[in-house]
Amino acid sequence: MAANGKVVSEMIAWIKSQKLIAPRMKDAPTFYRNLEEALDVRRSTQSLMTRGQSTWKTGDAIDFCSNDLLSLGLTGELRREFLAELARHPDFSLHSGGSRVMGGNYDYIEAVEQEIADFLGAETALMFNSGSNGNIAIYTAIPRPGDAIVYDELVHFSTHTGMAASLATTKVAFRHNDLDAFREAMSSTMDSHPMLQDGSRSILVSVESVYSMDGDVCPLVEMLEIAREICPKGNFAFIADEAHATGVVGPRGVGLVKLLGLENEVAIRLNTCGKALACTGSVVLGNATVRNMLLNYAGSLVNTTAPSFPSVAVIRAAYNLMRTGATQKAQDNIQHLVKYFFESITSSNIWDKATDLGILSIPVAEDYESLDFVTHIVPIWTRQKYNWWLFFHLQLAKIAVVPIDYPQVPKGKSRVRVMIHAGNTEEQVDYLVATLCDFANEMIDIEEGGEKGKIPKAAQEIYALMAAHA
């Protein structure tokens, strides 16, 4: 397998980063040694996260991993619109001067927020410096004492962080996208809380439009029907994280909620800017009451400097492109490429045997022809012990993907995540399919050969590098 020097050097840097450090720190201060012991827990399973630069950024690998979903960063389209926006406001200030409630508010940010709210069918919009900050703000500011939160088990980590600090007295998880489990969670929560039964407190339902690790879509319409049935007094509110729907789902990227016409049914939406929009920040959508609660009770807003003019201008530039339909062709190409990938790999000669043996599996490809739309997130499953081998195989083939392992997903649920972008090509997808099939063929040969302890060539190469740099 011919990997170029940049790919190998990045792998060597990663290997070195996974070496245990604490055992070599016997004479170091206790404070730092204890921290390294915590980091060594990650290193011991090769799961320590580092700042390593992905090889797709240097042009040494195909990008099947980044969040630049509409390829606005790749094409320079966003940069051009951003510079045009700056030119329209040549006297802008670089500094907001404070938090939104402590001298940092200004006309431009309010105007952009209202434009976004109008475009997405909301009464108000409020900007945050990141999606995580927005999520944490929602769950620390909105739930009242006595409220309950019922949440999908796969909601974002930042949602869990916010819930942990919330005033809600009850938090109940339900099995991912399982309507029966959701009904049971809603019923049991309602039955065990008199203040929910009498309508004086509310159940907040936390979901994502598109799930970041599984790539599937929330059954939002059906969940709302169940909530109305379980809560006849109407004391429930849905909170939808649209991080992976913003820009790529619905006409002009309006997201799942607006696509389904549920703007008035979902109380709060979080639309992030760091994925399809190729910038940073997030916007929380809701009515004036929700906005005022956030302005008064969200510490991550009250105590944080407001986004600067350039930060807001690039968000406006992205929404300008969406609103005018300039990103629709990119959206359509994502749909085409994902379906092309599904068709290509499921029709390959090795597919049936590989899936029967558990060597390759793509759950989101099942019945994809019947779906209204597919998502850009394509998790590739293999046997758990093969997950890193699959990653090594793709990495050395100059395909940049992300191995997803614990703690990002539950133990036993590891997978390799492929992200398909508007800027990818059919030829790149063909190469991805061929490389996955090569891996499947090699693993089948190993299993059928019966040679104990034999490992695939890519893993041999990586393990040799590990030994050389031990």
UniProtKB/Swiss-Prot annotation:
Role of this protein: Aminoacyl transferase; part of the gene cluster that mediates the biosynthesis of sphingofungins, bioactive molecules acting as sphingolipid inhibitors via inhibiting serine palmitoyl transferase (SPT). Within the pathway, sphA transfers aminomalonate onto the sphB product 3-hydroxyoctadeca-4,10-dienoyl-ACP to produce 3-keto-presphingofungin. The substrate specificity of sphA using only aminomalonate in Aspergillus fumigatus is responsible for the biosynthesis of sphingofungins B and C but not E and F like in Byssochlamys spectabilis.
Gene: sphA
Residues with the N6-(pyridoxal phosphate)lysine modification: K275
GO MF annotations in UniProt: pyridoxal phosphate binding; transaminase activity
Biotechnological applications: The sphingofungins A, B, C, and D, show a limited antifungal spectrum of activity but are especially effective against Cryptococcus species, fungal pathogens causing opportunistic infections in human.
Catalysed transformations (reactions): aminomalonate + (3R)-hydroxyoctadeca-4,10-dienoyl-[ACP] = 3-oxopresphingofungin + holo-[ACP] + CO2
Keyword Transferase listed: yes
Protein EC: 2.3.1.-
Phenotypic consequence of gene deletion: Completely abolishes the production of sphingofungins.
Subunit record text: Homodimer.
InterPro entries for the chain: Aminotransferase_I/II_large, AON_synthase_class-II, PyrdxlP-dep_Trfase, PyrdxlP-dep_Trfase_major, PyrdxlP-dep_Trfase_small
Family membership: Belongs to the class-II pyridoxal-phosphate-dependent aminotransferase family. BioF subfamily.
Protein name: Aminoacyl transferase sphA
Induction line: Expression is positively regulated by the sphingofungins biosynthesis cluster-specific transcription factor sphG.
Signal peptide start-end: none
Species the sequence originates in: Aspergillus fumigatus (strain CBS 144.89 / FGSC A1163 / CEA10)
Cofactor(s) needed for function: pyridoxal 5'-phosphate
GO BP terms: biotin biosynthetic process
Pathway of action: Secondary metabolite biosynthesis
Binding locations of pyridoxal 5'-phosphate: S212, H244, T272
UniProt superkingdom: Eukaryota
UniProt entry keywords in alphabetical sequence: Aminotransferase, Pyridoxal phosphate, Transferase
